A protein has these predicted regions:
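Extended basic-aromatic, gly/pro-enriched interface segments that bind polyanionic ligands
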Residues: 146-228, 232-240, 265-267, 285-287
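A short glycine-rich, Lys/Arg-flanked "PGG" loop and its adjoining helix->strand segment in the class I
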Residues: 242-254
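Residue-level signal for inorganic ion chemistry
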Residues: 106, 227, 252
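Conserved AdoMet
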Residues: 2-120, 261
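Conserved SAM-binding loop of SAM-dependent methyltransferases across substrates and taxa
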Residues: 126-143
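Conserved class I S-adenosyl-L-methionine
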Residues: 116-129, 149-151
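Class I S-adenosyl-L-methionine
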Residues: 263-288
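Conserved beta-strand signature within the Rossmann-like core of class I S-adenosyl-L-methionine
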Residues: 254-262
Length: 288
């Protein structure tokens, strides 16, 4: 004869086997909260994505109702769960040397500058973009101390931790030349075969920190020669996009460059920036 499960285990089993309900009201509240905290606009067709990502948080916390989860969040505005909430709903699509036409532009710009060349990757995700910037600058300017620096930020603390670790599958580095792979990465052996790690010499030139682009001021060591803010504005509404772009203005050095994603058009949003090349912008008063 099988003995009955304790009540707590029965509840947990039900959570695992039954689909929790996400009401219209709770979905709308989630959309409001992520907009307030991160500026991210969630359309109705993102509902399944929201459900699938947040239901993991509920199960981790032993909750069986979205209303209870939202009440827990709103009861403590300083709760660490807010960061987990943001991390769950941010999208991180990236690759080494994504939108490859930007990197020769960066290299040529760096060659013409004097002093330490400083770049900010404003949506660093898991590190592929800032390390691509670092490789480009190392190939162009060398590795002498004080010659260049990459500052990398993201709102998602989990992806920043992966970026700091600098470990990737080797098949993710197909866009690198064999020389770059050998010069800037160490290959894993034994149980780590198929993985690579960024060499410390390169990693030392990249600094990671959490930054929320919704903040009125950015705690970043500007001004910069170049800012990469690619494929992140698409998640914000027009007013938020305009506010972010205007905050970039004092963070660019004279004749500095702002790089956008392939589907983003910054010159249509604010007068402060004008197109210089394919999704490359400069301050309008400096337009050639």
């Amino acid at each position: 004869m099988t003995s009955p499960m304790p009540p707590g285990q029965t509840s947990l089993l039900l959570q695992m086997t039954q689909r929790l309900a996400l009401s219209d009201a709770h979905f709308r509240r989630i959309c409001q909260l992520i907009y307030q905290r991160a500026g991210i606009v969630l359309a109705d067709h993102k509902r399944d994505m929201v459900y699938n990502r947040l239901v993991r948080r509920l199960r981790t916390l032993g909750l069986d109702d979205f209303g209870r989860y939202l009440s827990m969040l709103e009861a403590n505005q300083n709760s660490a769960e807010w960061q987990a909430f943001i991390n769950s709903l941010t999208t991180n699509l990236t690759a080494f040397f994504r939108e490859a036409h930007h990197f020769p532009v960066l290299a040529e710009h760096a060659r013409r500058r004097t002093g330490e060349y400083r770049v900010w990757s404003a949506a660093a995700s898991t590190g592929e973009e800032p390390y691509s910037l670092a490789i480009t600058l190392a190939d162009t300017l060398g590795m002498a101390p004080g010659r260049w620096k990459v500052y990398a930020s993201d709102i998602d603390t989990e992806v920043l931790e992966k970026a700091r670790n600098g470990v990737y599958r080797q098949d993710e580095l197909k866009t690198l030349s064999p020389q770059q792979l050998q010069r800037y990465f160490m290959r894993g052996t034994g149980p780590h075969e198929g993985l690579v790690r960024v060499r410390q010499e390169l990693a030392n030139c990249v600094e990671f920190a959490p930054v929320n682009l919704l903040d009125k001021q950015y705690n970043v060591p500007g001004p910069f020669d170049a800012i990469f803010c690619r494929n992140v504005m698409i998640y914000f509404d027009k007013t938020t996009q305009q506010n972010i772009l205007r905050r970039f203005v004092p963070l660019l050095k004279p004749d500095g460059l702002l790089f956008a994603g392939h589907s983003e058009n910054f010159s249509n949003l604010v007068r402060e920036f004008s197109l210089r090349g394919q999704t490359v912008y400069a301050l309008s008063k400096e337009k050639a």
